[in-house]
A protein has these predicted regions:
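Short, surface-exposed loop/turn segments at secondary-structure junctions
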Residues: 181-185, 310-315
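Helix-loop junctions and short alpha-helical segments
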Residues: 121-292
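Short, extreme N-terminal segment that most often corresponds to the first beta-strand
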Residues: 1-36
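Short, conserved charged micro-motifs
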Residues: 12-21, 90-96, 310
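Charged, non-catalytic interaction/linker regions at domain boundaries
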Residues: 75-135
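Amphipathic, Lys/Arg-enriched alpha-helical patches that create a basic surface
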Residues: 268-303, 312-346
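Hydrophobic/aromatic-lined pockets within catalytic cores
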Residues: 108, 199-203, 207, 211-215, ...
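Short, intrinsically disordered low-complexity segments
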Residues: 24-88
Length: 346
């Protein structure tokens, strides 16, 4: 649920509230509705990127209220309105409480919380606090699934006049002979690298988050003798890269054996075993690992040899999309067995 807390300040000015927010790491931000950006409504945003603390951040607006409302609430001309979205993290809600509490100490006044009432702060016990690892995995998994959903939505409505003409040619022998000029088949083949990018991102970034945030994975990394190039050391010192990302790059996350090796070593998760299960995908029982390997091989042949699979239809490509989705689902289920709370929105 989104939470809005308004502080009807007793003694504040526009300049004072702006300086206050800036001093507390709020940055000026424009509202996405242009009409809301006026001299009487100055928007700010707080967002903490480190350790996935924020998911949506805290919105704050310095507002000049009407004379009628000023008398109604017995407050200053300028008030402070804050909002956290429904999907906001525990830390976002916590920051919202803190900024209103600090502002009230400085400017006085009465606060109204649209969920908890007058002079009531948000009860943080109503919100689950996730670890950095849990939030990181949730963000990575949901981001991966969202991209797969987007490509499915695009293809569901995709039509090509030439492809439809070729599909209706008779006899079948003639249609088979002309399949090489079907533009849709080239399109579906060219989208295979997209699926591999999702696979690489999902497994690679989850691995990097484990060795950054998971205690036993970090301990193992600390005991590891890893050779690091001087250029990588400089990148770390400049905060242009991290040790976790450099270690991640030492594995090939477009290769299932390499993925399995990395996960087994640092997380004790056997990816091959996890994905070897037989599951129903698009109405058929498949071994997910086998189909995932076929996707990786198809991408390799297309990229390096321009090998076109002329049997790859829209339906078959969408089965591949579902296969990657199932691989993500099975991996998250395995991670949850270790006691991690992962929120999947799809």
């Amino acid at each position: 649920m989104s939470v809005e807390i308004t502080l009807y300040t007793k003694k504040s000015t526009k300049t004072g509230l702006i300086k206050f927010l800036s001093a507390n790491n709020f940055k000026k931000a424009r509202h996405f509705i242009d009409e809301m950006n006026t001299p009487e409504r100055i928007g700010f945003m707080w967002f903490e990127y480190d350790n996935y603390e924020s998911t949506t951040g805290v919105e704050a607006t310095v507002i000049k209220i009407s004379e009628e409302d000023r008398y109604k609430y017995n407050c200053s001309d300028w008030i402070l309105h804050t909002r956290t979205r429904a999907s906001g993290s525990f830390e976002d809600k916590q920051k919202q409480n803190e900024i209103i509490k600090t502002a009230r100490q400085q400017f006085g006044g009465t606060l109204y919380n649209d969920w908890y009432g007058t002079n009531k702060y948000t009860n943080l016990d109503d919100y689950r606090k996730f670890s950095a690892l849990e939030k990181g995995i949730s963000i990575i998994a949901n981001g991966s699934l969202e991209k797969l959903s987007q490509i499915r939505n695009c293809l569901n409505d995709y039509r090509n006049e030439m492809s439809e003409t070729l599909a209706n040619i008779k006899p079948e022998s003639m249609r088979t002979m002309l399949v090489s000029i079907d533009p849709s088949i080239v399109l579906y083949n060219s989208l295979m690298p997209f699926l591999v990018s999702v696979i690489e991102y999902f497994f690679g970034q989850i691995f990097a988050n484990y060795i950054k945030y998971h205690e036993s994975s970090r301990r193992m990394l600390a005991e590891e003798k890893v050779k690091i190039e001087i250029s990588d050391v400089i990148s770390i010192l400049k905060s242009e890269d991290s040790l976790e990302q450099i270690v991640m790059k030492s594995y090939n996350f477009q290769n299932l054996d390499s993925i399995n090796k990395a996960f087994k070593k640092y997380t004790s998760i056997d990816i091959n075993e996890t994905l070897s299960q037989k599951k129903k995908v698009s109405g058929k029982i498949i071994r997910v690992l086998t189909n995932l390997e076929a996707i990786l091989n198809a991408r390799h042949k297309f990229v390096h040899e321009l090998d076109i699979d002329y049997c790859l239809s829209k339906e078959k490509y969408l089965v591949n999309v579902s296969t990657v989705e199932k691989a993500i689902e099975l991996t998250i289920q395995r991670i949850k067995k270790d006691g991690l709370n992962i929120e999947i929105e799809h």
